[in-house]
């Protein structure tokens, strides 16, 4: 299982006809975290004309947005549409606007909020996360060199290595790749090495 989300919290801004738009974005995993982020931006920009939120939470398939006083359909939905177009989840976006005295019109607002959302996404970066198996492998020193090459070849990442009477390697690998890795490991080691799955986590794979 894989999904796309924002790599890190970030912000970006631009000015359109003297109105200042600031897009804030952050990865989150719960609706409570999303609401807390929105509240923090509203507190920071308490004097703004509008603070327009949008968020998508993977668990429960939750999507929420608000126009926060802008004409209906001109702010929150365009911001949410950017997140959906990028196939993002587990992220929250707030676009702060300081009105500059010049009306943008409905189409102008849609374009401005869409652009603010897009530059915030670009600033935060997009990462793909996959459900990964944490695998522990014990091998002798003669096989370690082949194991060290095999892990990246099969799409795995070494997290820790302990050199004692034998070598113990802790690695992670996307779940869909683990069976093929295990088969290759057993084949190359003539059955002397096998992986033990100790945990399952979501981790960045790009």
Model-derived features: positions:
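C-terminal regulatory domains involved in ligand/effector binding and gene-expression control
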Residues: 1-74, 196-205
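Conserved short beta-strand edge segments in small beta-sheet-based binding/regulatory domains
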Residues: 158-162, 189-206
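Active-site beta-strand/loop microenvironment that shapes enzyme catalytic pockets
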Residues: 75-123
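Short amphipathic alpha-helices in soluble, non-transmembrane regions
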Residues: 147-153, 180-189
């Amino acid at each position: 299982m894989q999904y796309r989300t924002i790599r890190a919290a970030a912000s970006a801004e631009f000015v359109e006809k003297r109105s200042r738009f600031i897009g804030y974005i952050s990865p989150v995993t719960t609706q409570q975290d999303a609401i807390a982020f929105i509240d923090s931006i509203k507190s920071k920009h308490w004097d703004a004309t509008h603070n327009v939120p949008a968020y998508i939470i993977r668990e429960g398939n939750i999507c929420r947005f608000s126009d926060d006083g802008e004409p209906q359909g001109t702010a929150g939905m365009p911001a949410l549409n950017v997140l959906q177009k990028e196939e993002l989840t587990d992220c929250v976006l707030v676009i702060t606007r300081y009105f500059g005295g010049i009306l943008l019109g409905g189409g102008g607002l849609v374009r401005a909020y869409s652009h603010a959302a897009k530059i915030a996404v670009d600033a935060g970066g997009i990462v793909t996360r996959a459900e990964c198996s944490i695998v522990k492998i014990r091998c002798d020193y003669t096989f370690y060199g082949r194991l060290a090459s095999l892990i990246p070849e099969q799409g795995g990442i070494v997290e820790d290595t302990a050199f004692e009477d034998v070598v113990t390697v802790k690695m992670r690998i996307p779940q869909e790749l683990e069976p093929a890795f295990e088969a290759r490991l057993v084949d190359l080691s003539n059955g002397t090495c096998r992986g033990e799955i100790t945990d399952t986590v979501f981790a960045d794979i790009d």
